[in-house]
């Protein structure tokens, strides 16, 4: 078993970061996630948003890893459960693979919460527990997978910034469009009065 942890601070408020987290895929930084299906989404009586999603991923595994695990297939599936608490301002996301579970398990947990000293920033705490079962060189493979997770976490943070930029651009476009819509009738009314 290998445990990997990380902490990152986003220079954006919690509301922005959690909105981006829900819209993170697809993105050009991590093209291995090829599909996201929402299986269930509901708000509980306390106002928390619960989501259960299925992520389809396509991994380019090195041939040595394919031969060690005895699989040519590289499409894998991950189930993801998240809970967004708008009152406490926390988002907890847990994911686990549902493919190749007889050989490997990757359990990941992400927590997003406002920075305690700066409400315009968000802290992401990330942890992954990797367990390779029943193959020789399991500790080597666990280390290799931890390295891949670390690299993908970096890509994930880049993707979050990309989504946030995209969301901000959409907001600016909508705002400009709304201003134009408001000004047009006002301009027409002013023109009609002359």
From Swiss-Prot:
Lineage: superkingdom: Eukaryota
InterPro entries registered for this protein in UniProt: PRELI/MSF1_dom, Slowmo/Ups
GO cellular component labels: mitochondrial intermembrane space
Keywords assigned by UniProt, alphabetized: Phosphoprotein
Domain PRELI/MSF1, first and last residues per copy: 1-172
Signal peptide start and end residues: none
Pfam families for the chain: PRELI (PF04707)
Residues modified as Phosphoserine: 46, 51
Keyword Acetylation annotated: no
UniProt cross-references to PANTHER family, sorted A to Z: MSF1/PX19 RELATED
Family: Belongs to the slowmo family.
Name of the protein this chain belongs to: PRELI domain containing protein 3B
């Amino acid at each position: 078993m290998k445990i990997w942890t990380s902490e990152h601070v986003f220079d954006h408020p919690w509301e922005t970061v959690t909105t981006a987290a829900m819209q993170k895929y697809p993105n050009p930084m991590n093209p291995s996630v090829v599909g996201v299906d929402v299986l269930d989404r509901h708000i509980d009586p306390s106002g928390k948003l619960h989501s259960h999603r299925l992520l389809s991923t396509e991994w380019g595994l090195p041939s040595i890893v394919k031969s060690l695990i005895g699989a040519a297939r590289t499409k894998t599936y991950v189930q993801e459960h998240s809970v967004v608490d708008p009152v406490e301002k926390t988002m907890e996301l847990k994911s686990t693979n549902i493919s190749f579970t007889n050989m490997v398990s990757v359990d990941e947990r992400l927590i997003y919460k406002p920075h305690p000293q700066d409400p315009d920033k968000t802290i992401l705490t990330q942890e992954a527990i990797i367990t390779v079962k029943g193959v020789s060189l399991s500790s080597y493979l666990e280390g290799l997978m931890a390295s891949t997770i670390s690299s993908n976490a970096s890509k994930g943070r880049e993707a979050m910034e990309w989504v946030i930029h995209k969301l901000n651009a959409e907001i600016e476009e909508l705002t400009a469009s709304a201003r134009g819509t408001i000004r047009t009738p006002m301009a027409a009314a002013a023109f009609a009065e002359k």
